[in-house]
Structures are given as structure tokens and as C-alpha cells.
A protein has these predicted regions:
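Boundary/entry segment of secreted carbohydrate-active catalytic domains
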Residues: 34-94, 132-133
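Aromatic-lined carbohydrate-recognition surfaces of secreted/lumenal glycan-active proteins
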Residues: 54, 129-131, 196-242, 288-304, ...
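Catalytic domains of carbohydrate-active enzymes, especially glycoside hydrolases
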Residues: 66-102, 111-127, 252-259
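Active-site clefts of carbohydrate-active enzymes
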Residues: 136-139, 219-220, 282-316, 351, ...
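Active-site groove signature of glycoside hydrolases
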Residues: 160-191, 214, 244-268
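Aromatic/acidic polysaccharide-binding cleft in carbohydrate-active enzymes
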Residues: 316-374, 387-397
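Carbohydrate-binding surface patches
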Residues: 397-469
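C-terminal beta-strand-rich structural cap/linker in extracellular carbohydrate-active enzymes
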Residues: 487-508
Length: 508
């Protein structure tokens, strides 16, 4: 699991009763604020989040069978530096560097070496290569790749094919990661796992990147949803999704370092009802298996034809998504997308609806994610000591504001240090994280109302009652590493928040 570092040093803490944007205060009577020392976490450069997006493009965009050229190849050192300046420490080249459109290693080098050298000069923890020759093998395969009447007669034959493919780029300076694939269906998992393990054999030093479907009711990907007698369709769908993830892990050898998924929450109107349940399921599995959790998050405005699917995000939306991800223990975050995906089918990405325009000019979304990346890396020395344990959601009956998106989680988790939570309007998400080394609990308490619905701007008050042994909480607002302490009165903490705001509290 995550590397943990804890030391007791003198830090600046203050006893606060209010904070701009997120107000926290104790209620009633209690002990003096000076009687207990708050837990203290120090900066450590070895603790950090993983951030990435799709790389700057070659200026060629292919959408729905049509191709157009922006007039400039953006695979330059200047553009890679601008990408890194967001806070991205992993470079996902996707289809900007390709091996499927060349006939020789020499042609591959002629097309791509300059771009790869520029990326290497900037410096990234990982530079991820995709190989659409291998992706094509996976996309056409159901069942496994190895055996009688299969594509490869034995494991050695598969390894030889993979070795031939990766020989184009394996020894290029800076290239140290391979994109195994994206969103394999249930019937492709055996082949997906075989390729994953083959890469591990023929290129053992490579970081292997992969991504799974995020979303629950997807019969095309997972198979038919067939409820048992007395079981709801929703519960059957969640069970099938869990089976999909467990099967993927088994097919990949049973010991993988992380799960990665995408499930973009902010649809044209409202929040997707599968977002929190998907996070809950994956965070639970990561907890069981001792894995990290990575997530692609929403940074694009996307249409299907003329129909808006995912809305353009604002600063509050980005904060809403970030708090929700950190609350579930996510330690790697990718932005979908950077300028736009350079190869789409059936999807249209609005120019200016992502971090960059088609011409790679910055938008305000670039600034939002630059702020979030810096904030999270500063907070890493605190939150990356904690692992996800469980969650609950809360909503007001007959709310005039839609709260349906919080109702799909199990809500069976019992908090270690909280005895009661109440809200005065809307909906809230509370997640529990735990530091096994210090035995500290952390709670992420978030106003989960959609930030863009009518009437959502008013403050929501959440009252949290902690168990009797706790007299104080250490508070971090919106993942900002500027802690302050609050003395609990009658063991209660009142929090005023607008949508998307969250506090991370450690009771002591």
C-alpha cells in the first residue's frame, strides 16, 4: 500500500471556529482546547499523487471518420513542459506516437523519435506508449489468445509477438511504461490478462498502465443482468460489476498494484447515479486487495451529435470531483481530456471545453486543474497516510434539489469514531479513511449537491457527532494543507458548506 511517514514536529496550528467558504464550529460545552495535542503530519517528497492526461497531439484530429489538421505538430518540448506545468507527472502518449501506421522500425523512428526525445528532455516519472497493433489483437478477441484454435499456440508464441512489437520503442530513452489497454469487456478479460502478463515477462521493467470500465448497468460490457429471486436489478448489476473487476484481477495474475477506471459524474443535467456506487465498489475492492485506486476525471465538454453528454466544468465542479475522489482514497487522477482525444468515434469534443483548445491554447480549465494538482501534492503528506474504509450518504426527504445520485451506495458501513450525522438540506457524503500506523481516523465530509442546479448555492449545515472519547478535531478544508483545530462541544461538529466543498477531519 501507500508509503507512510509520520513524525512529531512543531507545526503551526490554530484553534478556529470559522473559515471562509467552509465554516466549522463546536457546539455546547467542552474541555479546553489546550488539553490535547493534535496529530501532526509532515511534508515528505516521497509521497505524491500520480497525475496524467492525454499528451499534446501531432495536430491531426480524427473524429467520426473525418480528419483535419490544426496546422502544427504540438509534440514539442515547449508543449510537453506546458503539460507538465499542470502538475502532470505521467505522460500518456495515446495515439500521438504510433507503430501501427509504419512498416519498419526505421519509419517508426523517423515519425516519432523527435517527439519522444522532446518528452524525455522535459522529464516524467512515466512515459506511456500505446501500441495499436496489440490493441487490435485484443479488440478482435473473445476468450483467450493462447491454445488450440487460438491466435497463439502457446505462451512463448505470444511473448515472441509482444517482443517484436515492443522492439520498436522498448529501448528508446525515457520510454518506460506500456498502455495494456482501455475498458476490456468481460469476454475480453482472459486475453487482456494474457497480454498484461506477457508484457511483464518480456519487458519486466516497464510500468504497465490499464483502465477498466467504470459504471454498473452495462450489459454490453459485462453481460446480462439477471437478478436472483428477491434481488433487485440494481443489486444484481452491482454484483455483476464486482464480478467483472474480480475476474480482471484474476486474469491479470491476481496481484496487480492498482485499479483504474473512468466514470464521469457531471452529465448535461445533474450527477450520474452510478458515480458514487462505482467509487464505493472499487474502493472496497482496493481495500480488500491492498491496491491503489486511480480514476480518470472529467475535464471535457462532450457531445454525441448535437446532444450534450458531459457538461463543461467550472472551478466548483473540479473541486466537487476532487473532494469526492480523495474521500474514496484515490491516489492517481487522470484528466479526460487535455485538448481533445485525437481519435474519436461517435463523440464530439467542444473546442475550448478542455484544458486546451485544438490549437493548444490554455483555457480556464487548465488553471483549475493546475490549482488542484498543486493542492493535492501539498496535501499528499497527510492524506496518503490514510486508506479508505467505508462511506455513507445522507439526504433530506422530499428535497426540492435532486439528491438521487447519492442513494445508490450500500449505506451499511459503521463509522469507527462517528455516532451520528444530520443535515438540514440537500445531501452529503461522508467517507472514512484510516491510518494503520498511528490508528488515526480521517473523515471526508462533503456537500454532495450538484453545483449547477437551481437553488444549490445556499449553505448546507452538516452536524457530526463523534464518540465520547473525542474532544477535538484537526480540520483541513478542501484538501488544502493548512490545518486548524476545533474544540468539540458535546462531541459535535457543525459544518457549513456550499456544494462541492469538503472538510477532512481527524478526531482526537
Amino acid at each position: 500500500m501507500k508509503k507512510r511517514f509520520l513524525s512529531l514536529v512543531v507545526s503551526f496550528f490554530c484553534v478556529c471556529s470559522s473559515l471562509i467558504g467552509v465554516g466549522c464550529q463546536g457546539t455546547g460545552t467542552g474541555t479546553s482546547a489546550t488539553t490535547k495535542t493534535p496529530p501532526e503530519y509532515t511534508q515528505n517528497s516521497e509521497q505524491k499523487f500520480v497525475f496524467w492526461s492525454y499528451a499534446p497531439t501531432d495536430g491531426i484530429y480524427r473524429q467520426n471518420g473525418e480528419e483535419f489538421y490544426s496546422g502544427e505538430d504540438f509534440r514539442t518540448e515547449e508543449q510537453y513542459q506546458m503539460y507538465k506545468d499542470v502538475g502532470f507527472n505521467m505522460l500518456h502518449l495515446s495515439s500521438t506516437v504510433r507503430a501501427d501506421n509504419v512498416s519498419s522500425k526505421a519509419e517508426y523512428d523517423a515519425n516519432n523519435l523527435a517527439a519522444l526525445a522532446a518528452a524525455n528532455n522535459v522529464g516524467f516519472d512515466q512515459i506511456i506508449i500505446s501500441d495499436w497493433r496489440i490493441a487490435a489483437v485484443l479488440s478482435k478477441t473473445t476468450g483467450g489468445l493462447i491454445g488450440r484454435d487460438k491466435m497463439f499456440p502457446n505462451e512463448a508464441a505470444l511473448d515472441a509477438y509482444i517482443a517484436e512489437c515492443i522492439s520498436y520503442y522498448k529501448d528508446i530513452e525515457g520510454v518506460n511504461a506500456f498502455n495494456v489497454g482501455d475498458e476490456p469487456r468481460m469476454d475480453q478479460l482472459e486475453a487482456f490478462g494474457q497480454v498484461y502478463q506477457s508484457i511483464g515477462r518480456v519487458w519486466p521493467e516497464a510500468y504497465r498502465f490499464y483502465n477498466f470500465f467504470g459504471g454498473i448497468e452495462n450489459e454490453e460490457a459485462f453481460g446480462r443482468i439477471v437478478p436472483r429471486e428477491g434481488q433487485s436489478r440494481w443489486d444484481a448489476a452491482k454484483e455483476l460489476y464486482e464480478e467483472y473487476i474480480y475476474t480482471a484481477i484474476d486474469c491479470m495474475g491476481g496481484d496487480i498494484p492498482y485499479l483504474s477506471f473512468d466514470r464521469y459524474p457531471l452529465i448535461a443535467s445533474g450527477v450520474h447515479v452510478e458515480y458514487f456506487p462505482t467509487l464505493e465498489i472499487l474502493a472496497k475492492i482496493c481495500k480488500q486487495k491492498g491496491m491503489e485506486l486511480y480514476a480518470w476525471t472529467q475535464s471535457c465538454e462532450m457531445y454525441s451529435g448535437s446532444t450534450l453528454i458531459y457538461r463543461k466544468v467550472n472551478r466548483t465542479d473540479v473541486q466537487w470531483m476532487n473532494n469526492s475522489l480523495l474521500g474514496f482514497g484515490v491516489s492517481g487522477i487522470g484528466c479526460f481530456t487535455y485538448s481533445t482525444t485525437d481519435w474519436t468515434n461517435g463523440e464530439i469534443f467542444a473546442d475550448g471545453g478542455s484544458l486546451l483548445t485544438y490549437d493548444h491554447e490554455k483555457t480556464e480549465i487548465y488553471d483549475y486543474y493546475q490549482e488542484i494538482c498543486a493542492r493535492n501534492q501539498d496535501f499528499a503528506s497527510v492524506i496518503l497516510n490514510f486508506d479508505y474504509r467505508g462511506c455513507r450518504t445522507y439526504s433530506v426527504s422530499n428535497s426540492p434539489i435532486d439528491v438521487g445520485h447519492v442513494k445508490g451506495v450500500d449505506n451499511t458501513h459503521v463509522f469507527k469514531a462517528i455516532s451520528d450525522v444530520s443535515i438540514d438540506k440537500g445531501c452529503a457524503l461522508v467517507t472514512e479513511l484510516y491510518d494503520t500506523k498511528t490508528r488515526n481516523s480521517m473523515y471526508m465530509i462533503m456537500n454532495a449537491i450538484d453545483t449547477q442546479v437551481k437553488g444549490s448555492k445556499a449553505y448546507q449545515t452538516t452536524t457530526v457527532t463523534f464518540d465520547n472519547q473525542y474532544s477535538h478535531v484537526l480540520v483541513f478544508k478542501n484538501a488544502i494543507n493548512e490545518p486548524y483545530t476545533v474544540e468539540l462541544k458535546n462531541h459535535k461538529l457543525e459544518i457549513e458548506q456550499t456544494p462541492g466543498e469538503a472538510v477532512y477531519v481527524i478526531p482526537y
